[in-house]
């Protein structure tokens, strides 16, 4: 008896345990940069206010406004209750920072060091934290202020989108996966893309990779953008020989032909099975896409994996990027 052929996975075989996570800038996602500083124990709590005031005059920290000058002692059995930042290590010239005394740091006879103990070196965050994970890591070194962006916090927890929104995301990505499989049957790379109007929840364009057929630059994202342009009486190419690549005239697009359309992809979302390359990412910038959702990451990806083009401050358009939508199904496309 011949063994039964392995059945290909259908979309219903994939569970819904995936999370939609934001692709943040390096500033938002990197670990806190640390600076060495001198701290000293405050031996008498009643001297705290005076010491902080006088230290701020001798050693102001103008670029470290996020740092709290005083912290409670970490050890409950410590003989001193508080510790205070005296100055940065870089503010004092000394051949051996570990042998520095208060007289080295407080280079003035006007300072009353009563209530201040011997200095020691600590690491303090160089920049204010931008996300809660950064804040939690920074606070392990020294207390810092934090102005939380609630939307970023919800996004990092996978709580930014409602159940209905996630259901629609799955629906759109399933269409992209189906398009990718149609392209693969034609000998193309298995990559699919869908452009959606989030206001109407209607699909505007569907495309798969065509670069091995009509043109070497016809990546799935490029084809999808061009299809939207074609629907706005623009576009540069014809995709009739690829029936899975199509434009759908939504109500907003059809009405817009009479009243004037926004520039190409303004206000639209892109769903793509694989993280776009640099060329496609720049095309998304120029087409004014609103948001990008991708499934599988790639080593040379232009967003989360390597370049983070959507976060470049010198570009004249930026947009939000999310990853992880139907990640298993999208990764299987790469394997197959």
Swiss-Prot record:
CDD domains: nucleoside_deaminase (cd01285). The keyword Zinc applies. One of its GO terms (biological process) is tRNA processing. Residues 167-322 form the CMP/dCMP-type deaminase domain. InterPro entries: CMP_dCMP_dom, Cytidine_deaminase-like. It holds the Pfam family dCMP_cyt_deam_1. Keywords: Metal-binding, tRNA processing, Zinc. Its cofactor is Zn(2+). The keyword Glycoprotein does not apply. Belongs to the cytidine and deoxycytidylate deaminase family. ADAT3 subfamily. PANTHER family: CYTOSINE DEAMINASE FAMILY MEMBER (PTHR11079), INACTIVE TRNA-SPECIFIC ADENOSINE DEAMINASE-LIKE PROTEIN 3-RELATED (PTHR11079:SF156). This is Probable inactive tRNA-specific adenosine deaminase-like protein 3. It comes from Danio rerio. The gene is adat3.
């Amino acid at each position: 008896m011949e063994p039964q052929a392995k059945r290909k996975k259908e979309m219903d075989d994939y569970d819904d345990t995936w999370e939609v996570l934001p692709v943040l800038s390096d500033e938002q996602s990197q670990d806190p940069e640390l600076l060495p500083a001198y701290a000293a124990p405050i031996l008498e709590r009643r001297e705290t206010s005076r010491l902080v005031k006088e230290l701020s005059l001798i050693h102001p920290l103008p670029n470290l406004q996020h740092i709290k000058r005083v912290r409670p002692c970490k050890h409950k059995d410590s003989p001193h209750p508080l510790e205070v930042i005296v100055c940065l290590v870089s503010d004092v010239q000394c051949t051996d920072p570990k042998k520095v005394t208060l007289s080295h740091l407080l280079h003035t006879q006007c300072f009353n060091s009563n209530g201040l103990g011997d200095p020691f070196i600590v690491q303090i965050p160089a920049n204010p934290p931008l996300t809660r994970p950064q804040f939690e890591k920074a606070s392990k070194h020294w207390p810092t202020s934090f102005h939380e962006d609630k939307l970023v916090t919800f996004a990092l927890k996978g709580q930014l989108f409602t159940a209905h929104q996630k259901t629609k995301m799955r629906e759109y990505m399933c269409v992209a996966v189906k398009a990718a499989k149609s392209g693969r049957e034609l000998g193309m790379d298995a990559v699919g893309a869908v452009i959606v109007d989030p206001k109407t929840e209607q699909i505007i364009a569907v495309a798969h990779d065509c670069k091995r057929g009509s043109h070497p630059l016809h990546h799935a994202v490029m084809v999808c953008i061009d299809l939207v342009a074609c629907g706005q009486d623009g576009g540069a190419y014809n995709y009739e020989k690829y029936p899975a690549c199509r434009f759908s005239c939504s109500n907003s697009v059809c009405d817009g032909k009479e009243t004037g359309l926004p520039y190409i992809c303004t206000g639209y979302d892109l769903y793509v099975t694989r993280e776009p390359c640099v060329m496609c990412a720049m095309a998304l910038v120029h087409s004014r896409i609103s948001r990008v959702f991708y499934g599988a990451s790639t080593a040379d990806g232009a967003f989360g994996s390597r370049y983070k083009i959507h976060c470049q401050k010198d570009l004249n358009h930026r947009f939000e990027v999310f990853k992880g939508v139907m990640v298993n199904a999208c990764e299987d496309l790469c394997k197959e």
